């Protein structure tokens, strides 16, 4: 019977250890977080733009944090975007979709997973969008699709460049075909932006995957990426199981994706403001020259037509 008592005592110790572990809420509210070399104060991480000073890991941040860093606090206007009906399919799995949305809104303070802003960068007026990974994994549903289209429309109406900061796991399964249709809608909207000769810059952040990668994330005039960002369509294990080969080191990270030509530049978070501003200046001058050339060609054609008649 002695071994039974020992087993019971051991079980009680395990229960005590489990109870002593911090909850997700306690971890989120803590002054500390962890990175490569152990615990680090969130305050120190924030002062370094949420980049680890030891390993240079670019931690995930919210749209508002990102906009504060790149555009400056109180230097942007958050635009109110249309919000369609919640849960049109009455989706229910381990947790009702409506409850997931309520929890996401409470956690992020956002109505949907995308924030659209009107702002300026180096004296250039722009429209910008950023996704929040904490909002149902940054996935794209009808509300996010509406936000993206609203941002494009605002950019076209105000003749502004369009900058997108991607972050998310793809299309939202709880909205099925409604979610998948956002790939088409965002692509068509980008085509309209390009017809108006307005620059479209994509900044790929960790993680960018699935249908996001397969649609608007790869349609920019230029693609920038933060260091170490996961950029993929399918997961590495899925690919490895399909090709039955060992994948290269760093596969699907921004450094590897840059080598294959899908990313133009890898830019540190601290340098994004200057880099985006300078690239937009170049693109705007280029597009202005193209428009001027097209106008001259059109005038020449009219003159020739008039002379011929």
Curated annotation (Swiss-Prot):
Record key words, sorted: ATP-binding, Cytoplasm, Fatty acid biosynthesis, Fatty acid metabolism, Lipid biosynthesis, Lipid metabolism, Metal-binding, Nucleotide-binding, Transferase, Zinc, Zinc-finger
Tree of life domain: Bacteria
Coarse class of the protein's main subcellular location: cytoplasm
Entry's cofactor comment: Binds 1 zinc ion per subunit.
Cofactor: Zn(2+)
GO molecular function terms noted in the UniProt entry: acetyl-CoA carboxylase activity; ATP binding; carboxyl- or carbamoyltransferase activity; zinc ion binding
Record-linked SUPFAM superfamilies: ClpP/crotonase
EC number: 2.1.3.15
Catalytic activity: N(6)-carboxybiotinyl-L-lysyl-[protein] + acetyl-CoA = N(6)-biotinyl-L-lysyl-[protein] + malonyl-CoA
GO biological process, alphabetically ordered: fatty acid biosynthetic process; malonyl-CoA biosynthetic process
Binding site for Zn(2+): 35-36, 52, 55
Domain CoA carboxyltransferase N-terminal: 29-298
Pathway assigned in UniProt: Lipid metabolism; malonyl-CoA biosynthesis; malonyl-CoA from acetyl-CoA: step 1/1
Subcellular location: Cytoplasm
Pfam family, any one: Carboxyl_trans
GO CC annotation terms, alphabetical: acetate CoA-transferase complex
Protein family (similarity comment): Belongs to the AccD/PCCB family.
Subunit structure as annotated in this protein's UniProt entry: Acetyl-CoA carboxylase is a heterohexamer composed of biotin carboxyl carrier protein (AccB), biotin carboxylase (AccC) and two subunits each of ACCase subunit alpha (AccA) and ACCase subunit beta (AccD).
Role description: Component of the acetyl coenzyme A carboxylase (ACC) complex. Biotin carboxylase (BC) catalyzes the carboxylation of biotin on its carrier protein (BCCP) and then the CO(2) group is transferred by the transcarboxylase to acetyl-CoA to form malonyl-CoA.
Name of the protein in question: Acetyl-coenzyme A carboxylase carboxyl transferase subunit beta
Origin species: Pelagibacter ubique (strain HTCC1062)
Lineage of producing organism: Bacteria, Pseudomonadati, Pseudomonadota, Alphaproteobacteria, Candidatus Pelagibacterales
Encoding gene per record: accD
């Amino acid at each position: 019977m002695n071994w039974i008592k020992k087993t019971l005592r051991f079980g009680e110790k395990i229960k005590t250890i489990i109870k002593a572990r911090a909850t997700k809420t306690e971890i989120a509210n803590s002054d500390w977080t962890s990175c490569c070399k152990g615990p680090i104060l969130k305050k120190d991480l924030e002062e370094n733009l949420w980049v680890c000073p030891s390993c240079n890991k670019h931690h995930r941040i919210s749209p508002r944090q990102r906009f504060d860093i790149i555009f400056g606090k109180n230097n942007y206007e958050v635009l109110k975007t249309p919000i369609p009906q919640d849960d049109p399919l009455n989706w229910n799995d381990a947790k009702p979709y409506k409850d997931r949305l309520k929890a996401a809104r409470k956690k992020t303070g956002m109505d949907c997973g995308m924030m659209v802003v009107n702002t300026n960068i180096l004296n250039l007026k722009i429209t910008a969008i950023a996704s929040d990974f904490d909002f149902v994994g940054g996935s794209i549903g009808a509300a996010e699709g509406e936000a993206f289209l609203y941002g494009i429309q605002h950019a076209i109406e105000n003749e502004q460049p369009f900058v997108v900061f991607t972050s998310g796991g793809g299309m939202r399964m709880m909205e099925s075909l409604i979610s998948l249709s956002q790939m088409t809608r965002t692509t068509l909207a980008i085509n309209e932006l390009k017809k108006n000769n307005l620059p479209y810059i994509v900044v790929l952040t960790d993680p960018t995957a699935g249908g996001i990668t397969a649609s608007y994330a790869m349609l920019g005039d230029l693609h920038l990426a933060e260091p170490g960002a996961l950029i993929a369509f399918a997961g590495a294990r899925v690919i490895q199981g399909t090709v039955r080969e060992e994948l290269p080191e760093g596969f699907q990270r921004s450094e590897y994706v840059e080598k294959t030509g899908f990313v133009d530049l890898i830019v540190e978070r601290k340098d994004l403001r200057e880099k985006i501003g300078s690239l937009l200046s170049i693109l705007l001058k280029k597009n202005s020259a193209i428009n001027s050339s097209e106008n001259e060609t059109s005038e020449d054609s009219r003159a020739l037509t008039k002379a011929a008649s």
